[in-house]
Amino acid sequence: MGRFSSFRSYQIVLLFAAALAVVAFYYFGSEKQNFSSTTKRIKETQVSHNTNRDDADLSIDIRSGRPESRTGDGEELEGKPSRFHALMMFTKVNKSLNLQQKFRVTMRSVAKHGRFLEDEVLVLHYVSDAGSQELGKKMLPELLLGATFQYEVVFHDVGALTEKLFPIIEAMQKHFSAGSGTYYSDAIFFLSVAMHRIMPTELKRIVQLDLDLKFRSNIRDLFQEFNRFPAEAVIGIAHEMQPVYRHTFWQYRKENPKSHVGDPPPDGLPGFNSGVMLLNLDAMRHSTLYNQLLEPERMAHLAEKYHFRGHLGDQDFFTMIGMEHRELFYPLSCGWNRQLCTWWREHGYGDVFQLYYRCDGPVHIYHGNCNTPIPND
């Protein structure tokens, strides 16, 4: 009798398991999913996370440069993943809770809205000191946990880059830096100006981003703006959205009252904001005009002509040469760098401020410059 009872129990267990299997089959079928597609998504998510673990290669060398793709958005070789390169300055972050919070907002928004194809990789470059690099390695896996795309992380030593950069930009520092001298430590703020000379030639294009951003759109769409560059353009950059350069060019404007220098859009030349930049490094390398403008004599001539004295580094340089050579720049729409700072509205330019600050169209990236709070989605 005991044997018969145990046998009946065994049969009941088998029948119950079979019933569960049938229910599960129809449940997943109703969701239009199957074992293969579900497994595929899991694997893709695991790959995107694993590429940033401690065992990943985080050397300062760029391991994945690719020749230019046909579409102009990523860099690829046949049979290899297409790579999209983005760079951020990540220095002294370990000593600033404010910078850490800004970084969290930026990277979480990239992960939230980022969408790439299966064979594409977002390569995240960080120019960093040792302490910030250590912190970044701890923060990034958590911040990118929700990313559905593959990514790689590359840290560049700020000291090594500065050593290469300083001889190239030393002469321009007195025109575009705070203070009256040249400061070795400040050279890194001109990285975008001469990145084409110190990065490997395999790196064709890169997007440089400030730390105080919040994406509301897919970062991949930003790379598509490279496709819209006119023939002579080497840099994509949005206009400055405050009357900063109306103020900076005051003397030139006084001497040239019919000039549009410093005037608001659409007809004026308001200058540029470097919070979001598309750098076509290949085009920068091959542009005779752009490289001539890096020569100390040409720089000094333009600075004298426009009575220019700035303190915003690369942004000032691009603004000044843009007054003379607009063809070198592709103006990004204000939605790709929706600056939020309103400092100049309260400091003498309230009557014209809105002419600069207005931004029609969708906002893809908020830029919380001058510590301005960024709206919640």
Label the model's feature ranges.
Residues G2-D377:
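Glycosyltransferase catalytic domains, chiefly GT-A lineage
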